[in-house]
Design a protein with these regions (language model features):
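Recognition helix of helix-turn-helix/homeodomain-like DNA-binding domains
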Residues: 37-55, 103-118
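DNA major-groove recognition helix of helix-turn-helix/homeodomain DNA-binding modules
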Residues: 57-74, 121-136
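Short alpha-helical "recognition helix" segments of helix-turn-helix
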Residues: 31-34, 94-100
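Key DNA-contact positions within bacterial/archaeal DNA-binding proteins
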Residues: 30, 41, 73, 96, ...
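Helix-turn-helix DNA-binding elements, focusing on the entry/boundary residues of the two helices
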Residues: 29, 61, 84, 95, ...
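A short, Lys/Arg-rich alpha-helix, primarily the initiator
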Residues: 1-28, 71-91
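Intrinsic disorder/low-complexity detector
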Residues: 2-9, 74-80, 86, 134-181, ...
Length: 383
């Protein structure tokens, strides 16, 4: 079938387009099932984009197009990839809820859900409403989608819950070899799952909920502690709220605010609604974030060496660097025993355009800025 790959790749958006065609032609789900011979559960999966087998998808989409009297051109025309309806339905929010929060009209939101191109201002408002990032709304994210919400408060909790989005689960504490204390970070439910899945690997990448991504060399890690948010704080393991020297409780901050911090810091004009600008200012005020801290949040890198030495720097992902390549390879690689493609040294451009070269075997852990890192990986891999 012509354009079958495009239809399958955009199956969430195509599902929304089919719903719109059904509304326009006044065809119910029951009627579509009767005329195509498709079961109701299968149709629901087609409309939500949850069919994962391409052969089955191609078979069912052909039946649906024949029944509706439309071509693939109709479904693909003027479509812009976004997950607005998908996430809204997972969160069980009505389109009126989104309209009330964002100030975007219901009709305009419907157009966006059906594949119309949204402005950056609209995308940012929608991302704020869903407590996530613009990358997630556009379906461009490299790391697993995060919602700045308690995972237990996200609907469909259970063994079969949807892993498309996930929220705050608890904390991960990491003690590097020769490290003087544990470092703690907020993580999602899926990240916890990945830690167990990958713990035998030589390297692990851990996306966190405070705009940090961790790169761990497991040969140089002594201990990892996973702490459910309902557990008592581990006062014997350097818990930051007891020492008062760090802030980790930022799991409730939507990533879209981190995306906008740089513009706030530089005082640049940017596509942003008044409501979102107010949310950004409240975030900076509530956490008492200084200009130096903003620079660290958006561009900072922490290097924890195997010998216990710690260094702080900034990193420019659009200059000469290969750290984003190492992260994307480890995070997205299926053959975990094959690291021959990885460089033995890491290099990057840092503060005052200093070019640094580090032997990978001497690194225990890197702390990297989530948003800048993900955007660099997206651009390099044309995601």
């Amino acid at each position: 079938m012509q354009y079958s790959n495009d239809l399958f790749d955009l199956r969430i958006e195509i599902g929304n387009k089919i719903k719109k065609q059904m509304e326009q032609k006044k065809i119910s789900k029951a009627k579509l099932c009767r005329e195509t011979g498709m079961s109701r559960p299968t149709l629901d999966k087609m409309l939500s984009g949850n069919i994962t087998n391409k052969t089955n998808y191609d078979k069912h989409i052909s039946k649906i197009m024949n029944c509706l009297g439309i071509s693939s051109d109709v479904l693909l025309g003027n479509i812009k990839k976004n997950r607005t309806r998908n996430i809204r339905e997972i969160l069980r929010k009505s389109i009126e809820d989104i309209a009330n929060f964002t100030g975007i009209s219901v009709d305009r939101l419907k157009d966006i859900e059906y594949g119309a191109e949204a402005t950056l201002t609209e995308l940012r408002d929608i991302a704020m409403c869903f407590s996530t990032s613009v990358n997630v709304i556009q379906g461009k994210n490299f790391f697993e989608p995060q919602l700045a919400k308690m995972d237990l408060l996200i609907p469909n909790i259970g063994e079969d819950k949807n892993d498309d989005v996930n929220g705050f689960w608890g904390y991960i504490g990491i003690l590097t070899s020769h490290g003087k204390k544990y470092k703690w970070f907020p993580i999602t439910r899926i990240t916890r799952k990945f830690v167990y899945q990958d713990m035998e690997n030589k390297y692990i990448v851990i996306p966190c909920m405070n705009n940090k991504v961790l790169f761990l060399s497991m040969d140089n890690i002594d201990r990892i502690v996973l702490l459910d948010e309902a557990c008592d704080y581990p006062v014997d393991l350097d818990w930051p709220m007891d020492t008062g020297d760090e802030k980790i409780s930022e799991e409730e901050v939507p990533q879209v605010l981190y995306e906008l911090l740089e513009y706030y810091y530089l005082g640049e004009s940017v596509e942003m609604s008044d409501n979102l600008h107010k949310c950004l200012e409240e975030f900076v005020d509530e956490y008492k974030i200084s200009d130096d801290e903003i620079e660290d949040i958006i561009n900072g890198i922490e290097i924890h060496y195997a010998d216990g030495l710690d260094e702080s720097d900034t990193i420019e992902f659009y200059e000469n660097e290969n750290i984003s390549d190492a992260v994307s390879y480890v995070y997205d690689h299926d053959d975990y025993d094959d690291y021959d493609c990885m460089d033995e040294v890491l290099y990057y451009t840092g503060y005052n355009e200093r070019e640094s070269i580090i032997k990978l075997k001497n690194v225990a852990m890197l702390e990297l800025p989530f948003i800048k890192l993900e955007n660099a990986i997206i651009e390099k891999n044309d995601l």
